[in-house]
Amino acid sequence: MHGRQELPYHYAQLTICTTHQLLRFYHAFDNLIIDEVDAFPYAANASLLYATKQAIKENGGCLYLTATPGDALLREIKSKRLVVNYLPLRYHGHLLPQIKVRLAFGWRRRLERQQLPPQVIQQLQETLREGHRFLLFIPHIADLALVEAALRHSFATFRFATVHASDPERLEKVQKMRDGDYDFLVTTSILERGVTFPEIDVYVLGADDPVFSSSALVQIAGRAGRAQSRPTGRVVFWINCNCRQVNQAISQVKYLNRKGQRLIDGVSFV
């Protein structure tokens, strides 16, 4: 169910809907599963939280799913009002790709001359030589045109596009990436979650920009390594200087991998 659906609702044992549709229900569901609970529009939306509570039967249950719980959920967990369980391994049983940090001093100054740092170009070329595709995340929409111009010089024979939240062709470009029509996409954080492209590498230029929260960086890193055929994709963050959100993202991935390794080794954990 969603806002543009024309067919009327009818009872079913399983209902898949947007969280806004929960406003239509009262004590209707035995169990609710809310995916990406930390993401817009659900996060920090009091009306949707109220709708969730109203839609569940009095003795019903609710399961929140997220890779990056926000502060409110963490407080609920710490105070033992929520029970937490970890799924540190993906379906293929491999650890999450580790985040690697590389320095790219003055990349914006180079960008003004329609250039990118040599180490960035070399890394992207290496991925393409290996026969892999990639996502290149950048901080701001205003950076897209300059990054595209810089990439055209070094990647003239490759197929790529830029994409952002207001792009009228966003869905078509994402589908072309899925279909293999693009070798890479240059994107803002709009593709940080909710999309899966097999066997890709992930790069972030300017990962120390304040626009990227630690949770956003974890989600971005999570675009890599999702396929059974290549579960170890490369993740590289280029920064101007050390910053808290990058360090927090690295720590969270390492924490989950420690839990994942214990699971692989057959050791129980809490």
Each language-model region and where it sits:
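Non-catalytic, charged low-complexity extensions flanking SF2 helicase motor domains
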Residues: 250-270
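Residues immediately C-terminal
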Residues: 22, 38-42, 70-71, 143, ...
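Conserved segment of the helicase C-terminal RecA-like domain
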Residues: 56-72, 214-217, 221-254
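Conserved interdomain linker/interface between the two RecA-like ATPase lobes of SF2 helicase motors
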Residues: 81-144, 148, 155-160, 263-264
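Conserved helicase motor
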Residues: 1-10, 17-24, 139-142, 160-172, ...
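Post-DEXD/H (motif II) to motif III coupling segment of the RecA-like Helicase ATP-binding lobe
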Residues: 27-107, 113-115, 119
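A short beta-strand element within the Helicase C-terminal
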Residues: 29-36, 184-186, 192-208, 218, ...
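Loop/turn-to-beta-strand initiation segments
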Residues: 11-15, 28-31, 57-65, 132-133, ...
